[in-house]
């Protein structure tokens, strides 16, 4: 198997999974309490 291609594939896969996990943590985890909702701020 091509070692550089395998290393690059594993690196990119880990990068994508870590970014996805971090964004889910920010969106739904404890830090989500600090996010503001622009729709709640705009009252008609």
Swiss-Prot record:
Q: Name one GO cellular component term.
A: chloroplast thylakoid membrane
One matching Pfam family is PsbN
Q: How does it sit in the membrane?
A: Single-pass membrane protein
Swiss-Prot/TrEMBL keywords: Chloroplast, Membrane, Plastid, Thylakoid, Transmembrane, Transmembrane helix
**What InterPro entries does the record point to?**
PSII_PsbN
- TM spans (from-to): 7-29
Compartmental location: Plastid, Chloroplast thylakoid membrane
Q: Does the keyword Transport apply?
A: no
Domain of life per record: Eukaryota
- What is the documented function of this protein? May play a role in photosystem I and II biogenesis.
Family under the similarity heading: Belongs to the PsbN family.
Protein name in the entry: Protein PsbN
Report the gene name: psbN
